[in-house]
């Protein structure tokens, strides 16, 4: 993007992001965004739900009458709030995502650097691409829905404990958690098929990255009109170990005995007992769930794969 492609961009941020000096970070990001936005507004989101309210104001032209792109600086939870704001207000505007939190799984899908300064510079060469959105009951998400161990993981992270599915080794309490997972009964309907059983973890994925690691399934795409349900069979902690380590070249076929994979457009999930649900790192819902894919629902700035190769990760 060498010209001023957009008239008015709005950059949302929280003061409590993963960036140590948020104001310096905002300066770095704004330096890049103003190269392709004629006008850039920087908007603080003070409370949960503020971004959804701002999106409705933008939709109603009460914020400004010329906003034509929205940027978000934050982690997956903040991105999730923006996606809900876009979808619930039916705001047909493209978005740009700049990493600034503990996890930025979808940033990897966009081929962007995990550092906010570099990622904002890469947006200058990015192009808009359509992505599917997941609708979960009355909420929306870009990346995944998880039950079981993945919820335990999110709660551990929120409490300041070690991340089970992140980059750290499987040692200490992590091993104990994997070896002694809590199991639950499930009944899942995917399109015209019904499956039931008992498991320690269940994931419905749209994007290919969860907890910083790639799901080792080569044709998993966030814009193919399908969602992918993964049921982790009982006593499959070694499979959990493998899946959530960074092994991009892993042969998925070797693990099919430990994981059941069900692609679908519509999914219903019932559990006994009722289970908490992790949606892109946010634990706000409980089962039962009705999930469907909304194809090509949102346009997001994406760095072409060729330009993402060999990008430095330094500030």
Curated annotation (Swiss-Prot):
<keyword id="KW-0808">Transferase</keyword>
<feature type="binding site">
    <location>
        <position position="221"/>
    </location>
    <ligand>
        <name>Mg(2+)</name>
    </ligand>
</feature>
<comment type="function">
    <text>May catalyze the ATP-dependent phosphorylation of lipids other than diacylglycerol (DAG).</text>
</comment>
<dbReference type="GO" id="GO:0046872">
    <property type="term" value="F:metal ion binding"/>
</dbReference>
<keyword id="KW-0067">ATP-binding</keyword>
<dbReference type="GO" id="GO:0005524">
    <property type="term" value="F:ATP binding"/>
</dbReference>
<dbReference type="GO" id="GO:0005886">
    <property type="term" value="C:plasma membrane"/>
</dbReference>
<dbReference type="GO" id="GO:0004143">
    <property type="term" value="F:ATP-dependent diacylglycerol kinase activity"/>
</dbReference>
<feature type="active site" description="Proton acceptor">
    <location>
        <position position="282"/>
    </location>
</feature>
<keyword id="KW-0444">Lipid biosynthesis</keyword>
<feature type="binding site">
    <location>
        <begin position="75"/>
        <end position="81"/>
    </location>
    <ligand>
        <name>ATP</name>
    </ligand>
</feature>
<feature type="binding site">
    <location>
        <position position="224"/>
    </location>
    <ligand>
        <name>Mg(2+)</name>
    </ligand>
</feature>
<feature type="binding site">
    <location>
        <position position="102"/>
    </location>
    <ligand>
        <name>ATP</name>
    </ligand>
</feature>
<comment type="similarity">
    <text>Belongs to the diacylglycerol/lipid kinase family.</text>
</comment>
<keyword id="KW-0418">Kinase</keyword>
<dbReference type="GO" id="GO:0008654">
    <property type="term" value="P:phospholipid biosynthetic process"/>
</dbReference>
<keyword id="KW-1208">Phospholipid metabolism</keyword>
<dbReference type="InterPro" id="IPR045540">
    <property type="entry name" value="YegS/DAGK_C"/>
</dbReference>
<keyword id="KW-0479">Metal-binding</keyword>
<dbReference type="Pfam" id="PF00781">
    <property type="entry name" value="DAGK_cat"/>
</dbReference>
<keyword id="KW-0443">Lipid metabolism</keyword>
<dbReference type="InterPro" id="IPR016064">
    <property type="entry name" value="NAD/diacylglycerol_kinase_sf"/>
</dbReference>
<protein>
    <recommendedName>
        <fullName>Putative lipid kinase SSP1993</fullName>
        <ecNumber>2.7.1.-</ecNumber>
    </recommendedName>
</protein>
<feature type="binding site">
    <location>
        <position position="45"/>
    </location>
    <ligand>
        <name>ATP</name>
    </ligand>
</feature>
<keyword id="KW-0547">Nucleotide-binding</keyword>
<dbReference type="InterPro" id="IPR005218">
    <property type="entry name" value="Diacylglycerol/lipid_kinase"/>
</dbReference>
<dbReference type="InterPro" id="IPR050187">
    <property type="entry name" value="Lipid_Phosphate_FormReg"/>
</dbReference>
<feature type="binding site">
    <location>
        <position position="226"/>
    </location>
    <ligand>
        <name>Mg(2+)</name>
    </ligand>
</feature>
<dbReference type="Pfam" id="PF19279">
    <property type="entry name" value="YegS_C"/>
</dbReference>
<feature type="domain" description="DAGKc">
    <location>
        <begin position="1"/>
        <end position="140"/>
    </location>
</feature>
<dbReference type="InterPro" id="IPR001206">
    <property type="entry name" value="Diacylglycerol_kinase_cat_dom"/>
</dbReference>
<keyword id="KW-0594">Phospholipid biosynthesis</keyword>
<dbReference type="InterPro" id="IPR017438">
    <property type="entry name" value="ATP-NAD_kinase_N"/>
</dbReference>
<keyword id="KW-0460">Magnesium</keyword>
């Amino acid at each position: 993007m060498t010209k001023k492609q957009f008239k008015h961009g709005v950059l949302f941020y929280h003061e409590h992001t993963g960036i140590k000096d948020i104001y310096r970070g905002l300066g770095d990001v704004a330096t890049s965004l103003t190269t392709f936005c004629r006008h850039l507004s920087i908007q603080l989101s003070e409370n949960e739900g503020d971004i959804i309210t701002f999106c409705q104001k933008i939709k109603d032209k009460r914020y400004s009458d010329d906003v034509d792109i929205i940027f978000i600086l934050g982690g997956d939870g903040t991105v999730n709030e923006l996606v809900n704001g876009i979808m619930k207000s039916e705001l047909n505007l493209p978005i740009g995502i700049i990493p600034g939190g503990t996890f930025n799984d979808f940033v990897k899908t966009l081929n962007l650097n995990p550092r906010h300064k570099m990622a904002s510079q890469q947006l200058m060469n990015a192009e808009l691409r359509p992505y599917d959105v997941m609708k979960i009951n009355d909420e929306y998400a870009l990346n995944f829905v998880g039950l079981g161990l993945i919820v335990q993981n999110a709660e551990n992270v929120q409490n300041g404990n070690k991340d089970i599915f992140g980059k750290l080794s499987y040692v200490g309490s992590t091993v104990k958690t994997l070896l002694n997972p809590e199991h639950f009964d499930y009944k899942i309907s995917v399109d015209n098929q019904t499956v039931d059983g008992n498991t320690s973890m269940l994931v419905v994925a749209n994007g290919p990255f969860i907890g910083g690691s790639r799901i080792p399934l080569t044709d998993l795409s966030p814009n193919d009109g399908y969602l992918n349900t993964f049921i982790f069979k009982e006593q499959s902690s070694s499979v959990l170990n493998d899946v959530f380590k960074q092994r991009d070249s892993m042969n998925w076929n070797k693990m099919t005995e430990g994981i059941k994979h069900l692609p679908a457009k519509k999914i219903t999930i019932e559990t006994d007992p009722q289970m908490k649900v992790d949606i892109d790192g946010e634990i706000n819902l409980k089962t039962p769930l009705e999930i469907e894919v909304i194809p090509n629902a949102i346009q997001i700035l994406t760095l072409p794969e060729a330009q993402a190769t060999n990008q430095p990760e330094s500030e």
